[in-house]
Amino acid sequence: MTSNFFPYKEGTATFLIDPYVRVYPIAILMGMIISILTVAFFWRKEKFNFDHFFALLFIIIPSSIIGARLWFVFERLIYNPQNPFPGSAWYAIWEGGLSIQGGVALPAILSLVYIYFKRDYIDYRKALSMILPTVLIGQAIGRWGNFANHEVYGKIDPTGQSSLIFGEWLARHMFIYNANESAASAAFRYPLFLYESISSIIGYIIIVWIIQERNLLKPGSNGGLYFVYYGTVRLAMEPLREESYFYYSLAAMFSILIGGMMMIYFEIWANPSRYVKTKIGKFRYQYDWTKVVVDKKDKKIKFQSNNNKNKTEGKIKKYVTK
């Protein structure tokens, strides 16, 4: 049966327009665009200034690519220091080699720094909730770029049923041999990229379009939920990987820990009096950000809200402390 399948070498690229346009960068670009459009939807819903949105884009887009590549380079240097980039170079990003951990970590840190300095204009809790979970749809689409590059596959599947169940076309591209081996060693692999893509789509729908859209959790908690979800999925997939390192499992557990701490902080410890919670439908809520400002001239307390026109000063005073 396997004799009917052409063996693909690990890292062999699939072209949309041969030899100029690879599928890999197109998939990454599409994932970014849908993530950006999702954030824009919630940004407009919260009536945030789009000048800050475009400033964040200027930070996030390049830093996500740089961070993803740097993390990949770091991984290669750790696990194969003698020859980390066989037949390639550390900067050859067009040949694949992006790590989602770095693609999230670096832009998240830089975005938090920007939002901190603009905290009088952007509610950082809501920004975290609306930005971080949208990474899931970028991951889901980006995994198909990995598929096109014949990477992010699992261990050998002797029967090939894990791929054949999704059709012969997909199974053909899962008949792979490692870059440091001969074509004779080619075998069916578990379609790990597909499992991660499907799980990311499910997480995107639940976290973004059910929990976030309905404000079922307090502002900020969704950002933590992303880390918990991603870490859990990553940890569950680790046993299926061709090369499973303790480092990856440790990173996944750290992601779950950080996400859990964020959720506890925003749901329990963070000052709830900064928000006015309003039920606007069945299982649908609205959190209005409020802030106490003391006028320096007349020493009077003023109350600001991102949706002040829908709240009387009495209602705001009821929920806001000095």
UniProtKB/Swiss-Prot annotation:
Keyword Transferase part of the UniProt annotation: yes
Chief subcellular location: membrane
Top-rank EC class of the record's enzyme: transferase
GO cellular component, as recorded: plasma membrane
Compartments where found: Cell membrane
Record-annotated membrane-spanning stretches: 23-43, 53-73, 97-117, 191-211, 250-270
GO molecular function terms listed in the Swiss-Prot or TrEMBL record: phosphatidylglycerol-prolipoprotein diacylglyceryl transferase activity
Membrane topology: Multi-pass membrane protein
Family: Belongs to the Lgt family.
HAMAP family registered for this protein in UniProt: Lgt (MF_01147)
Protein name per its UniProtKB record: Phosphatidylglycerol--prolipoprotein diacylglyceryl transferase
Species of origin: Mycoplasmopsis pulmonis (strain UAB CTIP)
Gene for this chain: lgt
